[in-house]
Amino acid sequence: MLEGCILAVSSQSKSAKAITNNSVPGAPNRISFAKLREPLEVPGLLDVQTESFDWLIGADSWRQRATARGDVNPTGGLEEVLTELSPIEDFSGSMSLSFSDPRFDEVKAPVDECKDKDMTYAAPLFVTAEFINNNTGEIKSQTVFMGDFPMMTEKGTFIINGTERVVVSQLVRSPGVYFDESIDKSTEKTLHSVKVIPGRGAWLEFDVDKRDTVGVRIDRKRRQPVTVLLKALGWTNEQITERFGFSEIMMSTLEKDNTAGTDEALLDIYRKLRPGEPPTKESAQTLLENLFFKEKRYDLARVGRYKVNKKLGLNTDKPITSSTLTEEDVVATIEYLVRLHQGDTVMTVPGGVEVPVEVDDIDHFGNRRLRTVGELIQNQIRVGLSRMERVVRERMTTQDVEAITPQTLINIRPVVAAIKEFFGTSQLSQFMDQNNPLSGLTHKRRLSALGPGGLSRERAGLEVRDVHSSHYGRMCPIETPEGPNIGLIGSLSVYARVNPFGFIETPYRKVENGVVTDQIDYLTADEEDRHVVAQANSPLDDEGHFTEDRVLVRRKGGEVEFVSATEVDYMDVSPRQMVSVATAMIPFLEHDDANRALMGANMQRQAVPLVRSEAPLVGTGMELRAAIDAGDVVVSEKAGVVEEVSADYITVMADDGTRHTYRMRKFARSNHGTCANQRPIVDAGQRVEAGQVVADGPCTQNGEMALGKNLLVAIMPWEGHNYEDAIILSNRLVEEDVLTSIHIEEHEIDARDTKLGAEEITRDIPNVSDEVLADLDERGIVRIGAEVRDGDILVGKVTPKGETELTPEERLLRAIFGEKAREVRDTSLKVPHGESGKVIGIRVFSREDDDELPAGVNELVRVYVAQKRKISDGDKLAGRHGNKGVIGKILPVEDMPFLPDGTPVDIILNTHGVPRRMNIGQILETHLGWVAKAGWNINVAGADGVPDWAEKLPEELYSAPSDSIVATPVFDGARENELSGLLASTLPNRDGDVMVNEDGKAELFDGRSGEPFPYPVTVGYMYILKLHHLVDDKIHARSTGPYSMITQQPLGGKAQFGGQRFGEMECWAMQAYGAAYTLQELLTIKSDDTVGRVKVYEAIVKGENIPEPGIPESFKVLLKELQSLCLNVEVLSSDGAAIEMRDGDDEDLERAAANLGINLSRNESASVEDLA
């Protein structure tokens, strides 16, 4: 049975929990405004990766889960492929080779060493190979090494050649049978068709055309009457009439069919499939059998078999054994198509089962499945093994039977190459997004419809990209990229899981006779369509009864209506069940427009880790689980007492007497150049529980995700400096390093063997002053701690130059001074243009130390340079609601607007950024941020008791101290009336004054004049993120640099150290102002007049006047292009004479030719004698 069923044992009371994070020991107490009790913990957020890989390698943990699910004798992915392949027989069938029992040895090196030394984190794979000589019955068994197999780390990633990569799950159309409906343009008739799509093999398509005949296409070849196929399968006219007598169109198709009997039908099919080949009955029979009924050639896959059985009502209660088509499948498919065309709504199959007759929606999640990491790797291994199978067969025929052993037959190269190719080059094996922990977590939970066997951006239409009702609780409707991939790449919802068939399931609470139970059933999209589902916030009493007579529910296709409580089958487990992790971290999501929420979810992944992380005052309760599951914090494995704490490690003495040492990552570089640093948050002698966070990572505080900073924001225009989403910042954020981040760059150089001799890493560099070498050590490598700027030498290296024949004097010098006099050139590693920082690490690998290095490389040096980037004009900031902007001005603290108690605001945002974008969540966050920062106390002791607005709040929320952290979960957070009440109940400051009014606004004073602004301004605390789009990475200037070889114009872009293009529109602007000489200069001597450039430089150096410009190189290129199109283009002077366009090289050529006495003019000499 597909439905997973678990019983959630709830330890919470029936009321909402006021404190989140209770399930994790030692977690900070975040006060929650949630009204609803969630009966189910959020599942492991990396399970989609880890469980799939466990299935592939047949891990014990997976076997236990499969057995608990009720699977009998579960088979792992590798085992499955080897079973499919075995036995490999030779062409005569006299010998065979079988494989079984895949197993792994220990991994070769730990994760850190693999990253350090550019190795792959892999374990050797061994299988048992058994060779059987069928003639003699002799069996030879051996354990065979099948190559190093990349293993998944605990975090769900792979280390390939030292870089961390993620394999993204792929969304594909499931194998199965799909019925479709279309309108014929000429006759406006409704036509129906059906495709039988296998996992591997030929497609089988049936359709009813406008002439009302039923046809079949085999393997996308020409259409034939469907009765030809039935006859080829051995059916007689009488049998066809008996089964399909109810259908006029089948009878008319039979009448038009001219084939008589099985043999003729087989030959007819053979002629269509193999035109030009002489047909025989045997070859036709074999062809048809091979196409659809032989496992080697046709594979529906288990999921395809399951889908076909389910759709056509066949053998639904029997376990799935075969994965080929059967004759009954073909017949039932034809009957279903015919009944669909004549308008029937149900069909009774031979077993007496009734199935609904309807067309399929291919975008429905019942028809789209996930290929997770395990299946993707399994498919790649299958490709490698099939290549190996060919080699084995060839060797069986060529080698001596007596001498054959499994080892001599097997060549593992194709398998190893296939695995390497997948991890190294596949579209689905991606360089891990390590900007911050959330970006890594989201990357592992990504669902992509692109990739091999999937869609392509160009062909994907609107329907497949659109949000579908079956996505509910399975794929997030919010989080998807902007741009050409919109809708093709999604993110798994928080509670979703993947079942053994690859379909995404989501959990629901079972409702029995109008009573909501704590039993949890996981449903696929197909199963959900058969049920009536109530929403998570439907009011319940303490016994679980619906308090209202009519309950709002949804049915198939997302249709919403009110029904009585007894009709309800299931209820959502949580209001955040439909969204992904990143979206679930947006507070007040319910008040944001979806387009802006999409930007908010995506921009959280671009936040850079700051020097000091700060958890949000206003969170959603998702921060803790996201940070722990992302794997960048250190979690205690066992309960115990902390023995020793330092910056580099924590030692815990566990209760069972074992000692655990947890090592910290210190200032490591992530894939995106951000700084990954871990620091302990426990003290020596402190007791820790199992699962408790003992050290923070990047972007975390006390184990919670902390992507940005809580800043005091004023929402108002300010002198036009925050026009069009520009942002005004206080200089305090610069001085106090509030928004400062550390970025680490890796620079690498290797010393190789060249044809002229070996390169050498040395301090002895020709033509370099001592000041330049000051920071290099005796090896020629920069010292740790050195401040470096662009152009500084990091590693000195010299490369031998090509040498001419030495004179006797030079030979004497060489004999006296040795290698010193050798000709070398400086090829040192220098800091790239525009970069600077402090050297924080050096790694040296050399052959002498037995380090593994690529062929021809003797030594390799890596230098890590860290840069501390303060916030500056041009950097991009954003909130969590899609409210993004670029810093337009950084004001001195004294000029910033300030509150009546003298507190200056940190950041000023423009009011225009809110109304038309409809992301009101940012305003509500600002209000609640102020409430959390100031603290509150609801007056419940007054005459009226608890105010009306606070009736739904738990007692724990009646008061809170200042600097409290709160959670407002998505779709279940603080209401507007509660916010108004809390704003009126905030605690006064130390002077006894309340700064912000009940409406969330405060009187602000202008920092420059001290005068109050004429209107109250919304002031509060907003969580602001510093994004990866930093101005330091974008700003660029060039004086001299590289040119394009063809056009002789400077290259473009920062990466090429290019120039600024003076384009077509800029030329128009110059023309409009009549600046003819400026324009001429720009188009010639400042750009691509090669001769003029040199002359101008010479004139400037000598202090002479600038000479006349020449002809630009691009003009010559244009002439050449026109001439290549066979157009005779000539350049005429003012008096009409043709001007010869020659390249500078041509002039040199002519001069050389004249010296040699060769004539290069058009009237060439007729013979060699004429030259003499």
Swiss-Prot record:
Q: What cellular component GO annotations does this protein have? A: DNA-directed RNA polymerase complex
Pfam families, alphabetically? RNA_pol_Rpb2_1 (PF04563), RNA_pol_Rpb2_2 (PF04561), RNA_pol_Rpb2_3 (PF04565), RNA_pol_Rpb2_45 (PF10385), RNA_pol_Rpb2_6 (PF00562), RNA_pol_Rpb2_7 (PF04560)
- Which InterPro entries does the UniProt record give? DNA-dir_RNA_pol_bsu_ext_1_sf, DNA-dir_RNA_pol_bsu_external_1, DNA-dir_RNA_pol_su2, DNA-dir_RNAP_su2_dom, DNA-dir_RNAP_su2_hyb_sf, RNA_pol_bsu_bac, RNA_pol_bsu_CS, RNA_pol_bsu_protrusion
- Give UniProt keywords alphabetically: DNA-directed RNA polymerase, Nucleotidyltransferase, Transcription, Transferase
Top-level division of the source organism's lineage: Bacteria
Catalysed transformations (reactions): RNA(n) + a ribonucleoside 5'-triphosphate = RNA(n+1) + diphosphate
Give the protein's recorded name: DNA-directed RNA polymerase subunit beta
